[in-house]
Amino acid sequence: MDPKNKTDKEWKESLSPEAYNILRKKGTDPPGTGKYYHHDERGNYYCAGCGNLLFEFNTKYESGSGWPSFWKPVEESNIETQTDNSLSRLRTEVLCANCGGHLGHVFEDGPKPTGLRYCINSSALQFKNISNKEK
């Protein structure tokens, strides 16, 4: 089944309450609380909703923002962006291209070589270390 065709009920049944709030309701993890914020294992980060590969460990960096930050996705085609004008300010929302789940936001204040900071909610992610053991 195409994840974009899942019903809200199906999402609610298949996700943890935290992941459902972030991915389907566009929520936000409280700053500094996510399990991947201070996380430095070698591996890859996947969408918690559908398993789409999103980020590699070697693009993660400490931004001081309170959320896991990456300077680029594995493939641009694995994410989508759209304008978000909630909270009375203009931002760029980052979505999983496979399931449409809300991941976080991207800002233009990141490190070289991209100058981008993908600020991603831990609850929207699933980590697998290099040996493919799920964490």
List where the protein language model places each region.
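A short Gly-Trp-Pro
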Residues: 2-135
